[in-house]
């Protein structure tokens, strides 16, 4: 009959207690990190509300529209609404408002920094909405790409997921892009919404910078526009031509590997009325459910 060694029992108990304490410490540290992340996110979203107050208190879009007619031949001047924002962050380039789904300041730098830093320059996982680094001439570019994090509470570009709902699309069909300069804000109308992968190995892969690299003529651009409309989950009766200015809003989506939700819009033409389009929009297919 085997007799347990009392010393082994003591050693085993000591090792067990040591492992238990280590597990407890790790659990506590992970909890602290999680709580800290949540607190930082909430503070970041509160700060965004402060930025909106600064921006809208200094903005008179009616007066700005009148000024733009006079100032078209003058050098660009900074709008009053952006003066305070530029003091906080000199890399500010504009403000994006996608109906009631996104209302954010926009910055320009590289494609990495603002994934992890807020508008105030603090490290924060909510990031900041930014223009693609390849849009260096963002003021005159005919194709703009704007990135924003997907937050489950709807912050940043998180609420763009509501474009999956046809009623939300109809209610948020237009997007306003206002640069820091004293020009009239540009109005855009959505013409394509779809999910894609950033991985070349996936069948739903889409290369975002294709517009920039199409310099061979209008036919190639027309084919790309046709592809965007074909990929869209909606039939949206918006005519798009190679001469139109196009904007793409990008956020993460979890229905495919390394997925992105892409919302394409084009600049509204002079005297164009888009409200009448709402009743003509048809949904073609369903999105993959979010995880």
Task: Give short role names for the model-derived ranges.
Residues 31-291:
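Solvent-exposed, non-transmembrane regions of membrane-associated and secreted proteins
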Residues 1-18:
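N-terminal Lys/Arg-rich, disordered targeting/topogenic segments
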Residues 20-31:
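Hydrophobic H-region at the start of alpha-helical membrane spans
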